[in-house]
A protein has these predicted regions:
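Glycine- and acidic
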Residues: 72, 129-132, 164-170
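Histidine-centered divalent metal-coordination motifs
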Residues: 129, 134-143
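Metal-coordinating catalytic core of metallo-dependent amide/deamination hydrolases
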Residues: 2-66, 166-186
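Active-site loop-helix segments enriched in His/Asp/Glu that coordinate
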Residues: 140-186
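Histidine-rich, glycine-flanked metal-binding segment
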Residues: 41-70, 77-133
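Redox-cofactor binding/interface segments in oxidoreductases and associated redox assembly factors
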Residues: 125, 137, 161
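A broad, low-specificity signal for short, low-complexity segments enriched in glycine/proline
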Residues: 34-37, 119-122, 159-161
Length: 186
């Protein structure tokens, strides 16, 4: 069996078990704990890659028979229940159908039964991306910096709104009034 270096593998398929990923421009790192894919049988989108008819796409299954509508390939998933895992994520009818190994079960080993891909499946290459559950709050009265901590602890990662603190203007509207006030809330 042919082998490639860890660096080559990382360049092609993204990080795997034991690799650490820096989160944005912080000093926080996560380590991949588990890889739910099969080494050497990864689904990859692109010219000359495996996500094509008869290879990674099952040519014997249709969308009506259960193949995915969308697959996110080789993505790093950060989840409070699963931990930090490398996997494919399948979407069917607008909902996550499964997290694991996707592909064509006719020729690929270890394909999760809910993650079969076909010609009806669209793809997002997730090789160097992180996928995590998150919520968005689109109407926030920003009255204190502590709101961000409360939001994060409840899964809200994105806030839209305005305000500069516990003032009547911030309580009544979501408008941020001026540069100096913005600097004070940050």
């Amino acid at each position: 069996m042919a082998t490639i270096s860890r660096q080559e593998y990382n360049n092609l398929f993204g990080p795997t078990v034991g690799d650490k990923i820096r989160l944005g421009n912080t000093d926080l790192y996560v380590e991949i704990e588990k890889d739910l894919r099969e080494y050497g049988d990864e689904v990859v989108y692109g010219g000359g890659k495996t996500l094509r008819d008869g290879m990674g796409l099952a040519n014997t299954m249709t969308s009506k028979e259960g193949s995915l509508d969308l697959v996110i390939t080789n993505v790093t998933v950060i989840d409070p229940l699963l931990g930090v895992v490398k996997a494919d994520v399948g979407v069917k009818d607008g909902k996550i159908a499964g997290i694991g190994k996707s592909g064509n079960p006719n020729i690929m080993h270890g394909v999760h039964p809910d993650l079969v891909t076909s010609a009806a499946t669209d793809a997002i290459s997730g090789e160097h991306l992180i996928l995590t559950a998150a919520g968005i709050d689109g109407h926030v009265h920003m009255i204190s910096p502590q709101q961000a901590y409360a939001c994060l602890s409840n899964g809200i990662t994105t806030l839209f709104g305005g305000g500069v603190g516990p003032t009547d203007g911030s309580n009544g509207t979501t408008i941020t009034s001026g540069r100096w006030n913005i600097e004070q809330i940050l």
